[in-house]
Amino acid sequence: MADQQQSPCRILVMASGFGSNFQALIDAVAAGRIRNSKIIRLFVNRKNVQSIKRAEGAGIPWEYFNLISNGFIAKGEKDEQKVAEARHNYDAALAERILSAEEKPELIVLAGWMHVFSSGFLEPVEKAGIRVINLHPALPGEFDGAGAIERAYAALKAGKITRTGIMAHYVIQQVDRGAPILVEEIEWNGEELAELEEKIHSREHELIVKATAKVVDEILEKRA
């Protein structure tokens, strides 16, 4: 089916900070690099972040939903069981907000979303047929989780590895272990940490656009 006969693929973005990857997606959708698609909403979990201004500038609705501010847990709670339960309840409530909306997404893109989802979010979203993808600044199976660039840099300096990279992948409960969508290796030429971080982040914008475009194409083809 031709694009003009199909409704746009509905994308929901989640971001926690500056939102440069979110901006790359906004620009790519506007330019048609991500074909026949529409960013329907932005979710943020931190107040007053630049991502909100980017959404407002593009006319994209946004919503703030936070673990503490929305009453799921008290600030400073240390009890591990209470924290785990609160995170699960928060995740389930966030999934419910998304799934009960009049306009539901077909794809969720985590663009600098600093929160690890539990089954409370992932199971209902998967059951609804919504794909969730993430960008991670490491190669598959290397440096999962937070601080990936710093850990890769330490390994590079120690001579344990000679390159690092970035990947876009599907999100599963195992952190950064979902099936890769696109992977790009990045050579290390002796740069210091700040230079390496800048080098990696400059490549992320292109990778998240290409990966989102690839998944959108698959969604549109499946529809047809």
Regions found by a protein language model. Name each.
Residues 1-224:
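One-carbon transfer enzymes
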